[in-house]
UniProtKB/Swiss-Prot annotation:
Originating organism: Solibacter usitatus (strain Ellin6076)
Protein name: Phosphatidylserine decarboxylase proenzyme
Keyword Cell membrane carried by entry: yes
Gene name per UniProt: psd
Molecular-function GO terms, alphabetical: phosphatidylserine decarboxylase activity
Lineage, uppermost ranks: Bacteria, Pseudomonadati, Acidobacteriota, Terriglobia, Bryobacterales
Keywords carried by this UniProt record: Cell membrane, Decarboxylase, Lipid biosynthesis, Lipid metabolism, Lyase, Membrane, Phospholipid biosynthesis, Phospholipid metabolism, Pyruvate, Zymogen
């Protein structure tokens, strides 16, 4: 399984610190650092996913659907990621990155409804095949580092990796009326492979 390079750097740094602690204080005192290093490798895992075909949108993140509701003429789907979920993010549709907007904010617990508007976040607009979808990478109480690897003008494939949020977070996806959301609150979804919406104006 792939590991995001950031996780490897963290793990190596922790192992170096563990070696120093073991030398200065004894091996038992190094065990907590070794365990944290192993968790970093687990947290930053990046499994391959089977991307579905058809006029669909896929989940941009692993996690639990916590909300599906109208918002400003659009439909908002919210996904909460706990610290044990894969945190590599993927684009929900194929298209071109139109806009990337960084918004400063708070670091409320990502499962809370108000974090969709109040927390620090990246707001990304993707347009393709006659539709526009907006998704938000939202920082949480623990996650305070949002990584986005694309730029406006970049083309992205359905389910392509586009970044990550470190340590517990949330992702929102905003769909227009041409989309039908196919998941409900309480469902678990996987980034890149779980279908979360279908085009109403396109045949499968």
């Amino acid at each position: 399984m792939k590991i995001v390079s950031t996780g490897i750097y963290y793990a190596l740094a922790l192992c170096a610190a563990a070696a120093l602690v073991a030398w200065l204080a004894g091996p038992l005192f190094a065990i907590p650092l070794i365990l944290v290093a192993l968790f970093c490798l687990y947290f930053f895992r990046d499994p391959d996913r089977e991307i579905p075909a058809g006029p669909v949108a896929v989940s941009p993140a692993d996690g639990k659907v916590v909300a599906v509701k109208p918002e400003g003429g659009l439909s908002r789907l919210s996904i909460f990621l706990n610290v044990f979920d894969v945190h590599v993010n993927r684009t929900p549709i194929a298209g071109t990155i139109q806009k990337v907007q960084y918004k400063e904010g708070q670091f409320l617990v990502a499962s809370r409804e108000e974090c969709s508007t109040d927390n620090e976040q990246n707001i990304v607009t993707v347009a393709g095949d006659g539709t526009t979808v907006i998704f938000k990478q939202i920082a949480g109480l623990i996650a305070r580092r949002i990584v986005f690897t694309k730029r406006p003008g970049d083309h992205v494939a359905l389910g392509e990796r586009i970044g990550l949020i470190k340590f517990g977070s949330r992702m929102d996806v905003l769909f227009g009326p041409e989309w039908e959301i196919t998941v409900r609150p309480g469902q678990r979804v996987s980034a890149g492979s779980s279908i979360i919406a279908r085009r109403l104006d396109r045949k499968s």
